[in-house]
């Protein structure tokens, strides 16, 4: 059978770096790498008393200050580059917008011209003229239908 002392309930998962349960190895914050050339230094501040916390904070701040100075310089350079890129993009974008606006204006003016021409061709017809045209159509259609009926009867 199975060994009585070993099962999933009895095995506690813990950190392989510091040995404390409650977090996994990749989540371990008890080790700090002060210098990349040196070995890993154990940071016991999370497990020690309140008196030693002040000392460990001061030690931790010193390397962090050096990093902050270099980080701020890098950040400033990045910001400058980003601003330049944004300005360049705006210039390109704004010029294309003005082209689009001019094209849109041309289209609108062409549409207006077409409307004006269409109206001029169509012109205004007065009611009397329309009535005359209708009468002429009716008379021409009735005469043509009567002539067609006469021709069919004569056959």
UniProtKB/Swiss-Prot annotation:
<dbReference type="GO" id="GO:0008270">
    <property type="term" value="F:zinc ion binding"/>
</dbReference>
<feature type="zinc finger region" description="CCHC-type">
    <location>
        <begin position="13"/>
        <end position="30"/>
    </location>
</feature>
<keyword id="KW-0479">Metal-binding</keyword>
<dbReference type="GO" id="GO:0008380">
    <property type="term" value="P:RNA splicing"/>
</dbReference>
<protein>
    <recommendedName>
        <fullName>Protein SREK1IP1</fullName>
    </recommendedName>
</protein>
<feature type="compositionally biased region" description="Low complexity">
    <location>
        <begin position="140"/>
        <end position="155"/>
    </location>
</feature>
<dbReference type="GO" id="GO:0003676">
    <property type="term" value="F:nucleic acid binding"/>
</dbReference>
<feature type="compositionally biased region" description="Basic residues">
    <location>
        <begin position="75"/>
        <end position="93"/>
    </location>
</feature>
<feature type="compositionally biased region" description="Basic and acidic residues">
    <location>
        <begin position="94"/>
        <end position="103"/>
    </location>
</feature>
<keyword id="KW-0862">Zinc</keyword>
<feature type="compositionally biased region" description="Basic and acidic residues">
    <location>
        <begin position="58"/>
        <end position="74"/>
    </location>
</feature>
<dbReference type="GO" id="GO:0006397">
    <property type="term" value="P:mRNA processing"/>
</dbReference>
<keyword id="KW-0508">mRNA splicing</keyword>
<dbReference type="InterPro" id="IPR001878">
    <property type="entry name" value="Znf_CCHC"/>
</dbReference>
<comment type="function">
    <text>Possible splicing regulator involved in the control of cellular survival.</text>
</comment>
<keyword id="KW-0507">mRNA processing</keyword>
<keyword id="KW-0863">Zinc-finger</keyword>
<feature type="compositionally biased region" description="Basic residues">
    <location>
        <begin position="104"/>
        <end position="137"/>
    </location>
</feature>
<dbReference type="Pfam" id="PF13917">
    <property type="entry name" value="zf-CCHC_3"/>
</dbReference>
<feature type="region of interest" description="Disordered">
    <location>
        <begin position="43"/>
        <end position="155"/>
    </location>
</feature>
